[in-house]
């Protein structure tokens, strides 16, 4: 069993959004997506990965198959493999999203 304090791995000093790995075991891969205001991840898709995104703090938008949706603290969303998705922190605060990847 491993324990990590999320506060210990938050880092918003990079120019681009960042992913901080948490745990990786077998088909499961978890990490934090960190977005300072204005930072984005371009639309992309995975052919063999389902993903769950849970907003820990802040708010922003996720675009799924060209449909934009606002996400805020405590929102959770599932993105199955093959679905196009991207992120944009449109707020004035940092945005922290827990990402859970499940490989086929």
PLM segments and residue spans:
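Well-ordered beta-strand scaffold positions
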Residues: 26-28, 59, 67-69
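Conserved short histidine dyad/triad with adjacent acidic residue
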Residues: 31-46
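Glycine- and acidic-residue-biased ligand/ion/polar-headgroup-sensing regions
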Residues: 48-50, 55-60
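A short, N-terminal "cap"/entry segment at the start of jelly-roll beta-barrel domains
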Residues: 1-28
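Short beta-strand segments in beta-sandwich/barrel cores
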Residues: 40-41, 58-64
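Ligand-binding loop in jelly-roll beta-barrel domains
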Residues: 81-104
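Short acidic-glycine-tyrosine-enriched beta hairpin
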Residues: 67-81
